[in-house]
Amino acid sequence: MLGRSANKSLWIAFILLAFTGCNRSQPKPEDTPTAMVQSVIPPEQHVVQKTFSVQKYQTFELTIPEHCLHPRLHGDFKTFHYGEQGNRANDDAANVDLLLLDEQQFNDFIHGPGEETTRSAQNTHDQVIDWALPATFGNPRKFFLVFNNATGKPKIKIIDANLTLSFD
């Protein structure tokens, strides 16, 4: 009878140990952080804020930082030429083309008559610009803003431009 009692006690001890072992709290698995891209909106960039002259074309480089979903180029420009009496005239003779070109388009433009543009305002002397630009994801993108005196007449044109790149 003693053998049965000892055997029973062993079984009870075994069951109690197993039961308490199952109820022991498990260590929490460590949370692995999910890779997230922090979206920080860069400050506005003044692409051009000045008055300058153009014979053939004048270029301004701009770079859209990576991870910008809604870049925008906005502002205005006016063009002038000097008339026969030396007076400043703002008329159709002062017209220029404003082109926004990516790197490949700009390369085509300077090495021949490039036809493709990202954005353009053509044959104008007084223009308000509000262009949505392509989003950037993992890499920044470079663009070229080109004021083009396509007709070449008059030979020199004066441009007063105020254009800003923002990242709403």
Model-derived regions, located:
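C-terminal motif of bacterial Sec signal peptides marking the signal peptidase cleavage site
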Residues: 19-21
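Sec-dependent N-terminal signal peptides
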Residues: 11-17
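Acidic, Ser/Thr/Pro
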Residues: 24-168
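Bacterial N-terminal signal peptides that target proteins for export
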Residues: 2-11
